Amino acid sequence: MYHPKALIIALLFSLSLILAAKSAEQLQIGVKYVPEECPVKSRKGDRLSMHYTGTLAKDGSKFDSSLDRNRPFEFTLGAGQVIKGWDQGLLDMCISEKRKLTIPSHLAYGERGHPPVIPPQSTLVFEVELLGIKNRHVDEL
């Protein structure tokens, strides 16, 4: 005979496993710092200047960093020039804002990976800072 409490505990445990699996499949955006003033936020079509450090979620090993090159990375947001997790995770960002992006493999390099530094099916973690939006100014609000 089943005990109602045991059944409820089993259901809650199953639900927590399902939710954990779902969150591993979704982009996670952690805001680390937001400036007090934010007159302009990033949007699709903006030319962004970023600093970033990328690591593998499984072991924390660093695979790339603009800081190591002492040179910001520039790209156009939403133009497909970067992985999908960046195009999604860097929207509505303030200049000087810092975020931590945890990007599941299907929004990064997927089944192929990016050999030799990023294995297939890798979840990636990026610490990012928006240094500037090159094509817009405060007066364009």
From Swiss-Prot:
Principal place of residence: endoplasmic reticulum
Keyword match Isomerase: yes
Keyword Membrane: no
GO process terms (BP): chaperone-mediated protein folding
UniProt activity-regulation remark: Inhibited by both FK506 and rapamycin.
UniProt catalytic activity: [protein]-peptidylproline (omega=180) = [protein]-peptidylproline (omega=0)
Keywords: Endoplasmic reticulum, Isomerase, Rotamase, Signal
Record-linked InterPro entries: FKBP2/11, PPIase_dom_sf, PPIase_FKBP_dom
EC number(s) reported in the record: 5.2.1.8
Highest taxon in the source lineage: Eukaryota
Protein family according to the UniProt entry: Belongs to the FKBP-type PPIase family. FKBP2 subfamily.
Organism (species): Cryptococcus neoformans var. neoformans serotype D (strain JEC21 / ATCC MYA-565)
Protein name (Swiss-Prot/TrEMBL): FK506-binding protein 2
